[in-house]
From Swiss-Prot:
GO terms for cellular component: chloroplast thylakoid membrane. The gene is ndhF. It is found in: Plastid, Chloroplast thylakoid membrane. Signal peptide: none annotated. It catalyses: a plastoquinone + NADH + (n+1) H(+)(in) = a plastoquinol + NAD(+) + n H(+)(out); a plastoquinone + NADPH + (n+1) H(+)(in) = a plastoquinol + NADP(+) + n H(+)(out). It comes from the Eukaryota. GO terms for molecular function: NADH dehydrogenase (ubiquinone) activity; quinone binding. It is a multi-pass membrane protein. This is NAD(P)H-quinone oxidoreductase subunit 5, chloroplastic. NDH shuttles electrons from NAD(P)H:plastoquinone, via FMN and iron-sulfur (Fe-S) centers, to quinones in the photosynthetic chain and possibly in a chloroplast respiratory chain. The immediate electron acceptor for the enzyme in this species is believed to be plastoquinone. Couples the redox reaction to proton translocation, and thus conserves the redox energy in a proton gradient. NDH is composed of at least 16 different subunits, 5 of which are encoded in the nucleus.
Length: 740
């Protein structure tokens, strides 16, 4: 086993040859490299599969031995400074490595077909492999310097992949927004690292924690300075994991290809902030108020992400806000000290959300045959509906991921979210109420996405995308609007017009929207073209990863079932995390009383089903359930209560669709303020500073010219002017200094 750990340093570098060889091939042999481009997809999958096998083997060793391994060697040594590099293999490392590799392999297989038509196919796989190297290097790092190096490389990969279609202005702006927002957190992370190095004199985790704990025990540190450094460290995690208030980049990051959203912005990169907090939890727990700050940021993000997901019309942005909310649950768990629950939810959410994103990619892929390549249309849930008949396999797997995220047993997220909800009662009743209420909101907005996408009829075939022109409560344009519209149900209505809970806005279609050429599935069928008027199911190379992730969603929750049976321990996750400490309630074993478990489970599932029921009531097409027509019609009738209810709903949806006006606030006050300062600085530099410099020259020139014309070349004039200057100088001197 010792020999196996000795070779673990190679894990981050195994995927690295792919981007290097692709780059060299495009420079030296561009034609041949492009001709055999699909070979590089195979190479990427093969190398990442090797890492996966290695990671699984190390994880088995971790579970059996309940230990960790660290190897460090000195890179620079002198009398005053030594920099050490190495790698650390512990339960947290092995969990993250398996997540990165398993989800990464599925995404790479999926991308081979999804990106087959794209001219940037090779560039895509080069970026993805380089991201795998960066992320694996991050999770195996043994000190803060290595963490920061790979942290920046991960941010670079995110920038490149979000802006993959950089010719689209929206994508270019999105990658810049993500880059700048993450730079704010990264700058804080760097300052925090330097601050703690100044305190402890070490970057390496074990020495760092030991020295710092001794300093705290002996009361030899300035708690104000230590708290500031800890907040700066936490700022890096806040930005990377899209926590409030640095969450604004994540929804715009959906401008990249959908496989990127599945791997980077759902399962791995956004989990880097959670990983950092989990890695530094022994540090944070001994600093006053930091753990409470982490939990506060987590609970705010939980609620904010869920409410902002309520009114999104873009399927990927809805899933992005869902990711933000679920990451908030993990951050809340870490702030409460529930280390096991946070990592458990990290595992289950990664597979469920990757399944949902790949499913949304399959939906978008099929919609492009009708509406064309336009993200504003192919990702618009208002143009979908009734897809269950056209993409049945995608529908089943998407429903599986939806129910998992809703917290329906026995799917994966039920087990992990239930633990966090139960632990929240031990920490704070207020936080618990918010967390449980948000669980209901999660079920509501996730089932809303499912119903708008798969139920009813294909809305793109209707003139107003609603099926019936004169049925206001049937239209499913409940998410908001593209711009400011006087008659939008999400804005204040005119006094002489009635308010409707559902929008009646009509969206025009392109004339040739229904007749599109089907993109090729494989190179062998490149010349095959067919015209489709309805969406079609994706190719097997896209369905296979979705199916595998569906299996993970079904069974991965069994890793952490929180009860034991006589004669055998079923809680594999607890054995896996045995070297770590559950800071919330340390127990000799992780068994749970069946009665307590069932009581909590019944309550959480009831809340989830209530959210599903409300979503079904509001979004399920009425013609599929005519029995409820009179009930729905009773809610549509006008009256004082109805008008008040509409105003409340319109306000909520307007607030949600406009992202709680946080982006607008940043744009107006931060971006606008910085732009105004830059313009003022430019004006001051060009007009004032340059004006003073140029003014001296101009004045000297004018004075010289004046003297030249006044003197006229006569000596008597020069003597007169000279005496006049002397007399003026003496007069000024007398007036100023005569009092002294």
């Amino acid at each position: 086993m010792e020999q196996t750990y000795e070779y673990a340093w190679i894990i981050p570098f195994i995927p690295l040859p792919v981007p290097m060889l692709i780059g060299a091939g495009l420079i030296l042999f561009p034609t041949a490299t492009k001709s055999f481009r699909r070979m590089w997809a195979f190479q990427s999958v093969l190398l990442l599969s090797i890492v996966m096998v290695f990671s699984i083997y190390l994880s088995i060793q971790q579970i059996n031995s309940r230990s960790f391994y660290q190897y460090v060697w000195s890179w620079i040594i002198n009398n005053d400074f030594s920099l050490e590099f190495g790698y650390l293999i512990d339960p947290l490392t092995s969990i993250m490595s398996i997540l990165i590799t398993t989800v990464g392999i599925m995404v790479l297989i999926y991308s081979d077909n999804y990106m087959a038509h794209d001219q940037g196919y090779l560039r895509f796989f080069a970026y993805m492999s380089f991201f795998s190297t960066s992320m694996l290097g991050l999770v195996t790092s043994s000190n803060l310097i290595q963490i920061y190096i790979f942290w920046e490389l991960v941010g670079l990969c995110s920038y490149l992949l979000i802006g993959f279609w950089f010719t689209r202005p929206v994508a270019a702006n999105a990658c810049q927004k993500a880059f700048v927002t993450n730079r704010v957190g990264d700058f804080g992370l760097l300052l925090g690292i330097l601050g703690f190095y100044w305190i402890t004199g070490s970057f390496e985790f074990r020495n760092f924690f030991e020295i710092f704990n001794n300093l705290i025990y002996n009361n030899e540190v300035d708690f104000l300075f230590v708290t500031l450094c800890a907040v700066l460290l936490f700022a890096g995690a806040v930005a990377k994991s899209a926590q409030f208030p640095l969450h604004v980049w994540l929804p715009d990051a959906m401008e990249g290809p959908t496989p990127i959203s599945a791997l980077i912005h759902a399962a791995t990169m956004v989990a880097a902030g959670i990983f950092l907090v989990a890695r530094l939890l022994p540090l944070f727990r001994v600093i006053p108020y930091i753990m409470y700050l982490i939990s506060v940021i987590g609970i705010i993000t939980v609620l904010l992400g869920a409410t902002l997901a309520l009114a999104q019309k873009d399927i990927k942005r809805g899933l992005a806000y869902s990711t933000m909310s679920q990451l908030g649950y993990m951050m809340l768990a870490l702030g409460m000290g529930s280390y096991r629950s946070a990592l458990f939810h990290l595992i289950t959410h990664a597979y469920s959300k990757a399944l949902l994103f790949l499913g949304s990619g399959s939906i978008i892929h099929s919609m492009e045959t009708i509406v064309g390549y336009s993200p504003a249309k192919s990702q618009n849930m208002g143009l979908m509906g009734g897809l269950r008949k056209h993409v049945p396999i995608t529908k089943i797997t998407f429903l599986l991921g939806t129910l998992s995220l809703c917290g329906i047993p026995p799917l994966a997220c039920f087990w992990s979210k239930d633990e966090i909800l139960n632990d929240s009662w031990l920490y704070s009743p207020i936080f618990a109420i918010i967390a449980w209420a948000t669980a209901g909101l999660t079920a509501f907005y996730m089932f809303r996405i499912y119903l708008l996408t798969f139920e009813g009829h294909l809305n793109v075939h209707f003139k107003n995308y609603g099926g019936k022109q004169k049925t206001p409560f049937y239209s499913i344009s409940l998410w908001g609007k593209n711009g400011v519209k006087k008659n939008s149900c999400l804005l204040t209505m005119n006094n002489n017009e009635s308010t409707y809970f559902f929008s009646k806005t009509k969206y025009p279609l392109d004339k040739n929207g229904r007749k599109m050429t089907r993109p090729f599935m494989t190179i062998a069928h490149f010349e095959h073209k067919a015209v489709y008027s309805y969406p079609y199911e994706s190719d097997n190379t896209m369905l296979f990863p979705i199916f595998v992730l569906g299996l993970f969603t079904l069974f991965v929750g069994s890793l952490g079932i929180p009860f034991n049976q006589e004669g055998g321990n079923l809680d594999i996750l607890s054995k896996w995390l045995a070297p770590s400490i559950n800071l919330l309630h340390q127990k000799s074993n992780n068994s749970m009383d069946w009665n307590e478990f069932l009581k909590d489970a019944v309550l959480s599932v009831s809340i989830a089903y209530f959210g599903i029921f409300i979503a079904s009531f509001l979004y399920k097409p009425i013609y599929s359930s005519l029995k409820n027509f009179e009930l729905i019609n009773s809610f549509v009738k006008k009256g004082p209560k109805r008008i008040l209810w509409d105003k409340i709903i319109n306000g909520i949806y307007d607030w949600s669709y406009n992202r709680a006006y946080i982006d607008a606030f940043y744009t107006r006050f931060l971006v606008g303020g910085i732009r105004g300062l830059a313009e003022f600085t430019h004006f001051f530099d060009r007009r004032v500073i340059d004006g003073m410099t140029n003014g001296v020259g101009v004045i000297s020139f004018i004075v010289g010219e004046g003297i030249k014309y006044i003197g006229g070349g006569r000596i008597s004039s020069y003597l007169f002017l000279y005496l006049a200057y002397v007399l003026v100088f003496l007069l000024v001197y007398y007036l100023l200094f005569s009092t002294f």
